[in-house]
Each structure stands twice: as structure tokens, then as C-alpha cells.
Amino acid sequence: MKSYTALLAVAILCLFAAVGVSGKCTKNALAQTGFNKDKYFNGDVWYVTDYLDLEPDDVPKRYCAALAAGTASGKLKEALYHYDPKTQDTFYDVSELQEESPGKYTANFKKVEKNGNVKVDVTSGNYYTFTVMYADDSSALIHTCLHKGNKDLGDLYAVLNRNKDTNAGDKVKGAVTAASLKFSDFISTKDNKCEYDNVSLKSLLTK
């Protein structure tokens, strides 16, 4: 059985290689100029529609992921969900976010049940960082890096959309190109028969 950290890597959109295989994360993921935090963190759900993992040795071929980002009790929060269409396993995590600079965040996470009961609490040295490289009302491009024991586990880029059935548009594709990436290298999650639990996901922002 994979360790919790390996499963968490999937649950937080970081489909990195197996735990223990480290790859330094890029320092060149730049946040969007003029990033509108209120629109991104409005409490609604973002779906992962396409992803690029630069440490792909242990990446599942099919997965579904979504996140809700919002503000609760004056704190920036993120609730994350993963669904494996093959095994039908689900994972939930809740994070409090620290803003390092506009569009750049560090998240200390805990593994929870769908009702918010804690399964694994925040662990020192285990966290993830993410950068919102582009965002508009309906789409976004983010870069994520999972850190275990203060070691990087590699880069993941994800294209998000507010609509789970929408193809990536020209603007977010342009952001991919501007980041010196090729959209053709991204893997789509659209045909994975994804199932989502948006009610639980949104409610976890208050946990």
C-alpha cells in the first residue's frame, strides 16, 4: 500500500513520482500580474481538466481532482478532492494558506474525512506551495510543488476550469505557452468518467 504522503500527492493535484524520489521544483513559476485573489478564492469549485507532471514515473493514468478555494473566519482555505475512477477511492484534504506574495501560497494540510473529521493532522515539514500563474473568471493555470521533510518532490502544472466539461480556452493555453510549456504535453482528465462531491468539498472550507 502506498504511504499517506504518496496518496496525498495525488489528492492535492501533485501526481508526483513515488515518495522518496525527489526533484527540485522550478523557481521560475511566476504569479499572474494583477492577480485577483477575490475571484479565485470565491468559495466555488475548480476542476482539474489537464495536467503536466514533470516527475511522471509513478503517475496514475486516470484520475479526477477538484478543489474549492475560499475564505473562512478570515483565513484563506483550500479543500482538495481526488477520485480514482478505477478503484473508486476518494481523498479529502484541507489546508490553511499563507500568502507569500500575491498569487503565491504555502499550504499546511491535514487529511480529513468528507465530514471534516481529521484522519492525519498537519505534519511539520510536509506542505505544498502553489502559484497562480494565470486566472480569469472561468479558467486558471497553477504550478504546485509538494514538499516532504522539506524536500521537493517535483513540479506539477494544472489547468483548472469552473466547468468540468469545458475544454481549455485560448487564454489559458496562451498562459501555458507564456510559461515556456507546450499544451500538447498536458494530459486531459475529461474522459475519465469523473465523479465529484462538491457539497462536501465546499463544506470543508469551514472545517
Swiss-Prot record:
Gene3D superfamilies linked to this entry: 2.40.128.20
Family matches, as Pfam families: Nitrophorin (PF02087)
Function of the molecule: Heme-based protein that deliver nitric oxide gas (NO) to the victim while feeding, resulting in vasodilation and inhibition of platelet aggregation. Reversibly binds nitric oxide (NO). Also binds tightly to histamine, which is released by the host to induce wound healing.
Name of the featured protein: Nitrophorin-1
One GO term (biological process): vasodilation
Keyword Isomerase set for record: no
A single GO cellular-component term on record: extracellular region
S-S pairs: C25-C145, C64-C194
Signal peptide region: 1-23
Gene Ontology MF: a single term: metal ion binding
Organism expressing this protein natively: Rhodnius prolixus
Keyword Zinc: no
Tissue specificity field: Salivary gland (at protein level).
